[in-house]
Amino acid sequence: MSKKIVVAMSGGVDSSYTANLLQSRGYEVIGVYMKFHPREEYHQKNIANIQKVAKHLGIEYHVLDRTKEFQERVYQPFVDSYVAGLTPNPCAMCNRVMKFTELIEFADELGVDNVATGHYAKTDGQFIYEATDKSKDQSYFLFNLKKEFLPRIIFPLGDWYKENVKKEAMKILLLKSIAEQKESSEICFVETNYIDVLKEHTEVEMPGEVVDTHGKVIGEHKGYMHYTIGKRKGFRLFKAHQPHYVLDIIPHKNRIVVGTKEQLEKRQIVLRGLNMFLDQKEFDCYIKIRYRTHKVPCHVKIDGSVASVTLKEPVYGVAKGQAGVFYDEEKVLGGGWIV
């Protein structure tokens, strides 16, 4: 008898091919699509793709409306973070509090042990690892998964290169149009840019002061929520300067602090809200402070839910609210939120 598995399906090529791959390995695939926001046109297009795949594979699929839960657990905290002068990482948060939690709970309702997604990552049931395709690796966004979920998760695309997934999908007539469609943006509820999302909920266009590290007013900006640490454009300085970067954001004063690249340098970072797969309290490893940055060697000391990180080489653009993820080569050891 074939083993059942619940597959998160988005209507894109990765999750569609994941379902196809698992069926070819003998699994009885049950597809599930989760609505996380009220953009109905977006959902209808995705569900139409899932219907195609389900028909081709002869599998059942379910549509779960989790708009209310997403609003409370991910969307509102995203808005609140920017209002507080932080730079949030909604995908890493969503993977923990929404996507995988809802997927596991739905599998439990059906009495199914395993779940799968089209993420480019690997797991051995204890740790998460980088995908073979480093250009598409999503392990950074998965550091926050509950440890007890890992033995139940399968990432079939962990050893695949994206270009090969698309090539193979193109060979299957009903998947061809899905393989040809444009890739979706990283943040599913952001159609254009995050500022447009914020404008729906709060005042964003608020001209304010640009100050140097001594508090001297040296320019003006268009509203602090437009900026993140390390940004060097979008504000005006009264006099010509060497390139200046955002060093800090002071929301209650609607101010941004700017300085030189040297002043942007960090060699110490503190993380809170840790999620660790490794039990050690002190260790050497690598840290990644943004999705598209390289890993930096560091020394970590953990005290409760706080990690003090000493970097062995400087990093720039460390933004409060972003995820700091610990690696041992390709293995994800855990991580937390930069404060």
From Swiss-Prot:
SUPFAM superfamilies: Adenine nucleotide alpha hydrolases-like. Residues 136-138, 290-291 are annotated as: Interaction with tRNA. The record marks 119, 322 as: Interaction with tRNA. It is found in: Cytoplasm. Pfam families: tRNA_Me_trans (PF03054), tRNA_Me_trans_C (PF20258), tRNA_Me_trans_M (PF20259). One of its GO terms (biological process) is tRNA wobble position uridine thiolation. Its EC number is 2.8.1.13. Disulfide bonds join 94-188. Coiled coil: none annotated. The keyword tRNA-binding applies. InterPro entries: MnmA-like (IPR004506), MnmA-like_C (IPR046885), MnmA-like_central (IPR046884), MnmA-like_central_sf (IPR023382), Rossmann-like_a/b/a_fold (IPR014729). It catalyses: S-sulfanyl-L-cysteinyl-[protein] + uridine(34) in tRNA + AH2 + ATP = 2-thiouridine(34) in tRNA + L-cysteinyl-[protein] + A + AMP + diphosphate + H(+). It comes from the Bacteria. The active site is at residues 94, 188. ATP binds at residues 8-15, 34, 118. One of its GO terms (molecular function) is tRNA binding. Belongs to the MnmA/TRMU family. NCBIfam families: PRK00143.1, trmU. This is tRNA-specific 2-thiouridylase MnmA. It comes from Nitratiruptor sp. (strain SB155-2).
